[in-house]
């Protein structure tokens, strides 16, 4: 049988361990800053109010080492439904390529005209296969749209740290 002091020591150790683990658990929980939270609420309302039509919404997602174009979603659908696409530019060049300023439009939001071809395209840097979007035209919506990536919302969107990270919109 264990002496009472040994039992107390074990109980104190277990309590201290639980407190430390609890603190670590809650430290990992992030809250979204109030301004960004309000902007996301407004973005959700704007998306819901988008008129239906023969167009898509695209967010340029430029990574120097990758060849995908960015995320594309149907009008009226949330960003969580968007697909990372390879752009077919046979009919229309991408905005940055038209200006010969590759990647200069990172995070810009566009109204895109075109369609998914149904084909899948291999992208070697990410070792991923992405749907092909055939671009026929575009209109710039915003150069400073509401954040859709976790790194943008947390304020930790350091390009060096995220160079090889492919984020998904939330």
Predicted feature residues:
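N-terminal hydrophobic targeting signals that begin at the initiator methionine
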Residues: 2-3, 30
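OB-fold and OB-like single-stranded nucleic-acid-recognition modules
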Residues: 31-170
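C-terminal motif of bacterial Sec signal peptides marking the signal peptidase cleavage site
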Residues: 25-28
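Bacterial N-terminal signal peptides that target proteins for export
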Residues: 3-17
